[in-house]
């Protein structure tokens, strides 16, 4: 009995000690263009690896053996959250330690699941995590961009579920959303996501976790992209580049790293490789690591994240899972990467010394990129999605669309209804900087607005104007039935004052030719220039 008590007290003491260590675990702070440890002020460099198993590498059926069911619950999501399954993360942490990794990039987590075991175990191992706020089914679509309530609720849920872990290094508000000149307008929506995520963290009084963006390295857009996310009143806290220029046994000069380093030497926020590791040669020699963490680059870049941990069809992994899924097999890349990471020690600067350098530089003010045929993202950003406004659609409008099982029916419904009424109030255009009153609402809510407008246009109809079992007919609700606040004031009517049921000329959000850039004076004749031309013509007429 005495032995049992001694063991019990030892376990309690160990747990308490572990919790004390976690409470003292230093978070990573952004200061100027560097990352610093919050406790010592020592500069932090990422030695990271991308960590996201796919259904091909792990079973979607969570095993969760020997784990309390209240702690971890299986998920129906069509992606695997490695930070919510201790069988995955605890298996892999020893391999991370051998690699010399101090940062994981995880592209999608399930905010409904518990992450305590994995996040605390990573913390005990000195490993930080940088998280993407999106997930495959809920993200900003570069081809039809929107910053809507569905995506915003997802982002908030991830922030809510992960903010308490001190080893959360930061959040990505987007990843390669703009990837060439054809979709630069999508960046306006990502920048709005950066703005709202930062504001939300501040409003909730959470630890000041930085929010940034991860871009590709497209030659035509990289300069404008890098300026856009740090110009004006809304600025990303950090900027990651998915960089694959250095392949095999290249060099600082040949790879393009020299040019990129020169371009970003005065960048005002931390910049790093959010992915790197070209695989044209296998096994990868990772010779770029000596340059990235060496004197040629370490004064500009804050390290990087190797793509990736798991071997898949794309052949970027450093481990391959055996058939039982329980035993990672180290590939040749693993030992090379481990040797490379463990042998580099970048020259760091203290926060105190860096403060003096910042004082000399002064405040930065970057101009937003000029609009052109290569860059069309407007400086005017979409509004913060208003949950109350969007819910008012469901509470007050006569025709309410329920979620459709067949997703192709959404397009059919849009094509029909926008041919009957003016859909300008649900349009979102990052080129013109125009965002309709209900452009921030969900797809179902947007269609509900337009279906209801068509119903109201047809004065004698007693049903919704589109045959579907997924449309709930609520009729034209009386004012007395409208939702009210505690003071008895109507909540919703203010949102529908400008609703126009008549068919008018529509704003075409898909039209992205240069002629549409009149909102900021691109390829247009200014008022002053027109007056000059008129005076010139008058002079000619006088002479002749």
Predicted regions and their residues:
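N-terminal signal peptide
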Residues: 2, 9-27, 539-544
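Active-site-adjacent substrate/metal-binding segments within catalytic domains
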Residues: 21-125, 159
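Short, acidic/polar
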Residues: 64-68, 77-96, 150-160, 220-232, ...
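Active-site groove signature of glycoside hydrolases
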Residues: 155-185, 212
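Noncatalytic carbohydrate-binding groove/subsite architecture in carbohydrate-active enzymes
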Residues: 185-300, 327-330, 355-377
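Substrate-binding cleft of secreted/luminal carbohydrate-active enzymes
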Residues: 284-355, 446-451, 455
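Secreted/extracellular ectodomain signature
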Residues: 379-514
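Cleavable C-terminal sorting propeptides in eukaryotic secreted/cell-surface proteins
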Residues: 519-544
């Amino acid at each position: 009995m005495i032995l049992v008590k001694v063991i019990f007290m030892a376990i309690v003491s160990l747990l308490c000690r572990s919790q004390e260590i976690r409470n003292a675990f230093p978070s990573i702070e952004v200061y100027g263009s560097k990352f610093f440890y919050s406790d010592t002020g020592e500069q932090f460099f990422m030695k990271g690896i991308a960590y996201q198993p796919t259904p091909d590498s792990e079973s979607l059926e969570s095993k969760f053996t020997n784990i309390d069911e209240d702690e971890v619950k299986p998920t129906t999501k069509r992606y695997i959250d490695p930070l919510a399954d201790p069988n995955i993360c605890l298996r892999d942490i020893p391999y991370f330690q051998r690699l010399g990794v101090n940062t994981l990039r995880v592209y999608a987590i399930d905010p409904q699941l518990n992450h305590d075991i994995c996040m605390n175990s990573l913390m005990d191992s000195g490993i930080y995590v940088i998280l993407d706020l999106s997930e495959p089914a809920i993200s900003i679509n570069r081809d039809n961009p929107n910053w809507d309530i569905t995506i915003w609720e997802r982002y908030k849920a991830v922030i809510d579920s992960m903010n308490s872990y001190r080893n959360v290094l930061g959040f990505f508000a987007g990843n390669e959303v703009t990837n060439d000149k054809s979709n630069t307008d999508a960046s306006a929506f990502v920048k709005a996501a950066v703005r709202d995520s930062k504001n939300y963290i501040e409003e909730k009084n959470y630890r000041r976790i930085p929010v940034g963006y991860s871009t590709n390295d497209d030659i035509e857009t990289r300069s404008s992209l890098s300026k856009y996310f740090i110009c004006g009143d809304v600025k990303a806290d950090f900027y990651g580049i998915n960089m694959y220029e250095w392949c095999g046994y290249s060099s600082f000069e040949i790879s393009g790293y020299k040019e990129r380093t020169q371009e970003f030497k005065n960048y005002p926020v931390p910049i790093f490789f959010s992915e790197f590791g070209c695989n044209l040669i296998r096994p990868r020699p990772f010779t770029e690591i000596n340059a990235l963490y060496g004197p040629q680059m370490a004064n500009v870049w804050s390290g990087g994240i190797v793509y990736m941990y798991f071997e898949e069809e794309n052949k970027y992994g450093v481990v391959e899972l055996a058939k039982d899924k329980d035993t990672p097999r180290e590939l040749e890349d693993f030992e090379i990467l481990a040797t490379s990471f463990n042998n580099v020690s970048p020259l760091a600067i203290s926060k105190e010394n860096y403060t003096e350098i910042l004082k000399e530089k002064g405040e930065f003010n970057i101009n937003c990129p000029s609009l052109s045929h290569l860059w069309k993202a407007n400086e005017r950003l979409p509004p913060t999605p208003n949950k109350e406004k969007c819910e008012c659609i469901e509470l007050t409008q006569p025709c309410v669309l329920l979620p459709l099982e067949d997703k192709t029916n959404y397009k059919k419904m849009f094509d029909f209804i926008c041919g009957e009424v003016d859909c300008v109030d649900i349009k979102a255009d990052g080129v013109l900087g125009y965002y309709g009153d209900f452009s921030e609402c969900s797809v179902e809510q947007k269609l509900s607005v337009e279906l209801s407008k068509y119903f109201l246009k047809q004065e004698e109809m007693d049903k919704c104007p589109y045959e579907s079992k997924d449309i709930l007919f609520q009729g034209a609700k009386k004012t007395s039935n409208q939702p009210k606040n505690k003071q008895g004031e109507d909540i919703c009517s203010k949102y529908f004052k400008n609703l126009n049921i008549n068919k008018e000329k529509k704003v075409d959000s898909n039209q992205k030719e240069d002629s549409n850039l009149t909102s900021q004076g691109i390829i247009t004749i200014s008022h002053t220039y027109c007056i000059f031309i008129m005076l010139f013509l008058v002079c000619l007429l006088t002479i002749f």
